[in-house]
Amino acid sequence: MDAAVIEVLQQAGSQDPNVLKPAEQTLKEWETQRGFYTALYNVFSNHSLAVNIRWMAVLYFKNGVDKYWRKNAPNGIEEDEKEFLRQRLISNFEEPVNQLALQLAVLIAKIARYDCPREWDVLIPTLLEVIRGQNSIAQHRALLTMHHVVKALASKRLSGDVRLFENLTHNVITFILNTWNTYTESFLIMASNGVDANQIQEPLEKALLLLKILRKLIVYGFHKPSLSENVMRFLEVIFERAHTCLEWRKTLVSKVFYCFTEAGQALAFERFIIQCLNLMKSILLSVWYRPAKGIGESKDPLTVRAYQLRQEFFTHQTLTEICSRLVTHYFLLTPADLELWDTDPENLAVDDGGEPWKYNLRACTQLVFLAIFHQFKDVLASVLVDLIQKHHQPVEPSDLHAILLKDAVYNAVGLAAFDLYDEVNFDQWFSTTLKEELKVKSNNYRIIRRRVCWLIGRWAGVKLSTKLRPEFYQLMIEALSPEEDLGVRLAAIDALKLAIDDFQFHTAEFTPYLESTFSLLFTLLKEVTESDTK
């Protein structure tokens, strides 16, 4: 069967649909045939074959595991074939192609999630044995596999699986920690001695994989990590290592120097900034960093100490600086945002699904702002009110920087609307300033018109009096005019929706505006193209 599988896999990689479609159909028919996955294993483990054929084989194997490896899966793989494959998959860790090595590691991890340790108790001991060995490439592949296996096992949340993972952690943590320490030390010594980058790469890659393994073990493998001697030793060492690495980083003056200059500021560590801000958010929101009740009633001394440390760090001065920095630096629309507005305003208006705070800097900073504002409202309310007073007056339409600052402040005020209920006289602000800003029609001022629509929508359910709602409806109808910028019109729609969804909404108040609103919405519906917008 191997020769036939190789031929069909080769056809499945063709650019000719007349060749591709029949090959895909044949592979689909073979998915449930006995011996198919053994044949796929034979193909991708044969280093003499073309990489693209081996790549197709491992992908089909991986997809087959998702569909047919479970015991109760329809047309599932037979147990004797699964046992054979489990043995063969961990018999050789010398895959020379990095991309295939990664796919193999993910494949083994998928099987481990179903079978380890009950049906595959030799997996972890085999990986540890290879890691202890002297074969450099096999050691790297085993570490890569161990990382993905630990990641897969850590994701299982049933109580029995959690206990099994805690047992696994107890058995391997000392070895993994010592091995990580060894490779990290080796990397730092090589780096300080000016060793060639190609030689440094090997210990660095292995140290990084071990660090990823340690992260999963420590986070998910201990009920109380602070009681583990290994965990506490790791935390002590990691801060020392971080300091050393940051000092050594200063010597990197060639390829990465540009990133640390003003010209390269846009390239500098955005992913790192996101990680740092998310760490701060996690500390602010963690139940382990604040007592359940009063500080004097908490029985856990670690919780009390963590709370005290948090309060000592977040002083009035520190909070003021953080809040001001978040709003006036990280909330600003960027040139890329403005370019997107010009080219694809619908995409700018649609909120990302999923969890954008994990990868998007603005989404991340907004959540950090909310977390810190909720926790320290008594301090930060006055800071934000001061920013409002500083930026609430109309600005010159030609002064783009002032417009962007005003937009950022209004964004913060909208996000913190509920926390500012007693601090802001929104009716007065609406009547004297906000409605007037909607009348400024310069191109740059579309930024403010859009933000004002959004801001009023956020406050409509918080503190917009009933007597002002008719005027609000009229302003939003004007903002929906076909002559208005599309970004502003989409913000006006959202504002209207929030007001209509509010429990204080009265049908009779809105009836005079219903026909014109519906007509404008229908006109806009014909203009937009994105399904999310529609």
What residues fall within each predicted segment?
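Karyopherin-beta/Importin-beta family HEAT-repeat alpha-solenoid scaffold
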Residues: 1-534
